[in-house]
Amino acid sequence: MFHATSPAVPPSATLRVRRYAELHGWNLLVAGTGEFSDARYRANPVDRCYFCKSNLYDRIRSMIQGTIASGTNTDDLADYRPGLTAAGERAIVHPLVDAGIDKSTVRAIARKYGLHDLAELPAQPCLASRVETGIAIDAGDLAFVDRMENSLAPIVGLQTPLRCRITRRGIVIEVSAEHVDNSNLREGATRLCAEMKRSLVDIRAYERGSAFVGKPSVVSAPDHA
């Protein structure tokens, strides 16, 4: 099993996977993938994920021989995933897709094997996904996003979708609709932004992938269209 570290990966995610690997005896490789050395990635085009996954898979290939399998599931094929193009170019296999397994089934499998906190873990796309297309990816910005989300999540509940977006207008907090008018959330977000010299411009209903501007509807991997 390979886990990538970079400024785009929340430190809590790395701690979690290390803890599980130690507990269950997984053969875990942890390494940086170097996407921040790639100017194409940092420029944050709409297909940024293509350059991220290209660096990721090339890094894994430099460390191991044999087949590389991703954790892509069938639900991922219905979303904009330029990283799947990078996977197809490198003959990465997608066993969950081949088996017709979607995200809910992955969660059910985790429950069956006693991995209950993983089964209930909210979706955690990389921190770079919070940055609006065309705004350069900066490690300091991603650390800010991580701090904001970790600080605000307890206010609305850890299972509630919450995103800190970096937009051209300023900082936007997205949260499930029932929490948009939460006064404690607004107070906390305003205070944190002021502490970090950022401008909070809006708290609005969560919209998946809203930071991607100009994205096509679907990008599927070769052999899995």
Where are each of the predicted segments found?
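ATP-dependent adenylation/nucleotidyltransferase module used to activate substrates
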Residues: 1-112, 171, 188-199, 207-225
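A short, flexible beta-alpha/helix-coil linker loop
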Residues: 36-37, 132-134, 178
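Short, conserved beta-strand edge motifs with alternating hydrophobic and charged residues
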Residues: 69-71, 120, 126, 174
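Mid-to-C-terminal catalytic subdomains of enzymes
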Residues: 97, 101, 107-163, 205
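Peripheral terminal appendages
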Residues: 140-225
